[in-house]
Amino acid sequence: MQTLNRRNFPGRQHPDRVIQFGEGNFLRAFVDWQLDLLNEHTDLDAGIVIVRPIDSDFPPALDTQDGLYTTIIRGLNEQGEAVREPRLIRSVNREINVYRQFDEYLALAHDPNIRFVFSNTTEAGISYHADDSLSDAPPVSFPAKLTRLLYERFCHFDGAADKGWVLLPCELIDYNGVALKELVLRYAAQWKLTPTFTAWLNDHNTFCSTLVDRIVTGYPRAEVEALQQEMGYQDTFWDTAEHFYLFVIQGPQWLAEELRLNKLDLNVRIVDDIKPYKERKVAILNGAHTALVPVAFLAGLDTVGESMDDALIGKFVEKTIAEEIVPVLDLPHDELTSFAQAVLSRFRNPFIQHQLLSISLNGMTKFRTRILPQLLTYRERHGELPARLTFALAALIAFYRGERSGEGDTLQTYPLQDDAHWLERYSTLWAGVKENTVSLAELVNVVLRDADHWEQDLTQVPGLAAQVTEQLQTIVERGMRAAVEGYC
């Protein structure tokens, strides 16, 4: 069987125009996949040089396949049909290990054609390392490595205005472009680089904050043999991802022309402020996940897909999003409903087995950040509590009992994953309920009164403790399926 490389699979190679910090599955099935589409369908003509930002030889470099690899995009499309789209990605030219090839790394700054810089160095990647210096080869932190490269470019081109870069970090932190620029400027000051360099950074480089959204499931270990037979070649870098993707860029509108986004209809938005899109994602996608988990799991289900296929639970999720989350968000209604429909399709993706227990990690914090803002805003705007969101809170409290109904009259226990103080508190409270020394109302009040966690005393929200207590009582006495029926 043939090995995947450019000799066996010749095709067009594009000039280096993009630097990418990070070689992981996400960027390869998100940024590199989109650039490959733009290269095929427009005149973008942009090749990518990947910079491996950490000192590691695992996985092997993409150079072993001349930068080629295959994506398998699969899920439900906009019509609700299951689709599967293999694609040979040709946008990556080569990979540089900054720790082994530092001179080649600096040489990237000398290339007049380089225009864009993408990165995904994990949430911890955009961070400050006090000991980093200009003379390090390389510095430790990603922002310091980038500052060194930018300074090399500034010096090589004598501060030319047209040699600045467009920087699009994809790390999952708020306003990632702002954070990255702040650290680059901090290193410039710490290293006592010239004021003209700082002016060049500010005036001729564009740092964009981004929001990225796609579930990338990565290397499909169990399917490799079948994929090799189907495609007719060996690929060490198979990369699988869902059909849905969204790339929101907070930046100038001229980016659409530079990236040729005006010539191909990709799901990329260039906006003035990324915040409403972040709130939409957190509230609808993450919020629906968080509301779903305890309800579905206590109803006897184990995966997101099973839950959405269940008539009762699927309807609960749909109504929660449509009637209690979407109405309180500040974006055009059409955009919100379209995104909500995409979320429901993603939840129903038959190619992804998303375990409810894996999503349950740190459920208390997730409820505070993902659902509580909508719950409180709904009450403020409508003068009443959103019944399904409060039911999700009651279900979450019930979930921390650590047991659900099994076959017959048996109880099934399961692992709980949260901060130790919550696990200890719930263990004590639920033991008290079992021994009739703590009432459900007392349990709910203890949970809601924790101002350190909720950042306020939720027992002061009129009617909340009473409503959650009543809903919890129904769950305990009648079981989850009977309890949730009234909200479907």
From Swiss-Prot:
GO terms assigned for molecular function: mannitol-1-phosphate 5-dehydrogenase activity; tagaturonate reductase activity
Q: Name one GO biological process term.
A: D-galacturonate catabolic process
What this protein catalyses is: D-altronate + NAD(+) = keto-D-tagaturonate + NADH + H(+)
Q: What is its EC number?
A: 1.1.1.58
Q: Which UniProt keywords apply?
A: NAD, Oxidoreductase
Which residues bind NAD(+) per the record?
Answer: V18, I19, Q20, F21, G22, E23, G24, N25, F26, L27, R28, A29
Q: What class of enzyme is it?
A: oxidoreductase
A single GO cellular-component term from the record reads:
cytosol
Pathway given for this chain reads: Carbohydrate metabolism; pentose and glucuronate interconversion
**Family per UniProt?**
Belongs to the mannitol dehydrogenase family. UxaB subfamily.
Descriptive protein name:
Altronate oxidoreductase
| Source organism (scientific name) | Pectobacterium carotovorum subsp. carotovorum (strain PC1)
| Upper taxonomic lineage | Bacteria, Pseudomonadati, Pseudomonadota, Gammaproteobacteria, Enterobacterales
